[in-house]
Amino acid sequence: MSQLVVTGANGFVGRAVCRRALDAGYTVTALVRRPGGCIDGVREWVHDGGDFDGLGERWPAGLRADAVIHLAARVHVMRDESPDPDAAFDAINVAGTLRLAKAAHRHGVRRIVYASSIKAVGERDGGVPLSETASPDPQDAYGRSKLRAERLLQQFGAANGLDVVVVRPPLVYGPTVRANFLRMMDAVARGMPLPLGSIPARRSIVYVDNLADALLRCATDPRAVGECFHVADDDAPSVTGLLRLVGDALGKPARLIAVPSVVLRGLGALTGRRAAIDRLTDSLQLDTGRITRVLGWHPPYTTREGLEATAAWYRSRNTQQ
């Protein structure tokens, strides 16, 4: 295999996937909505519109890709103001994914790797790390859209001879990370007291270069065909442990105050932040044994190595501002 298409290639995960693919000798076409932001060395293909309408008619002449790694999505947001969140997510994450699959199949692509999310399964593990056989129970519109896209994509692939691989990551971190993980780093770096010093809940996370490595393996390994894989770092730290690791990486110990989980949940209910607190106090561990058994894949980086790389970026970012 030599030709890959990566959607969302100018995003956080997309840049990491493209970098790893180029380093491995692949030719990469970056399918993006807006120009700019891609790494050097890729062929940029701008298609305005996240729903991929008309993609088949605008497929570049001469592009004969072997696989598509599909990262583009309407992403999860904490306070979605759409009048119909399910419809808004489905328009991009479900209908758009199917349009992409149809266009890719029409133009000879043999495999699509779909970057789903553990949110397609749920928000907590119930005391047992979530495997690929766990009964899905998505809790929000984003998770529901990801699950629907998985199922419809698998049906389309089975009916049309398109190889489909689904990858479900948890929270992704690494250099250029944004949103909640960056806010957490800001809080630790500024020495803010955090009431999370006694949270035993364990949360799987994945370093962006580990995820990129797994996605590329799924695009190229024949044993991945038809599979669904949970992908995460090897260790799932407790919430308290993660904050300490972040502090170590930043060279600034996290200021942690021991507040029982039950108290935090009560405060969350009183302040209207129940969902956010539940995500901190409930465990969400992934069972990643399947990708190891089927593909022999292991994360190339430890969580500590990933956090050190993220902290190095964070420090350089602050010196450049």
Language model segments and positions:
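N-terminal Rossmann NAD(P)H-binding glycine-rich loop of SDR-like oxidoreductase domains
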Residues: 4-24
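Active-site Tyr-X1-5-Lys
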Residues: 137-165
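Conserved Rossmann-fold NAD(P)-dependent oxidoreductase catalytic core, especially the SDR/UDP-sugar
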Residues: 98-141
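Conserved C-terminal active-site "lid" loop/helix of NAD(P)H-dependent oxidoreductases
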Residues: 208, 241-244, 267-298, 309
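Mid/C-terminal beta-alpha module of Rossmann-like enzyme folds, strongest
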Residues: 217-275, 304, 308-311
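Substrate-positioning beta->alpha
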Residues: 99, 177-183, 197-219, 226-227
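NAD(P)H-binding glycine-rich loop region in Rossmannoid oxidoreductase-like domains
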Residues: 47-94, 99, 103-106, 121
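Glycine-rich Rossmann NAD(P)(H)-binding loop
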Residues: 174, 196-201, 229-236, 245-251, ...
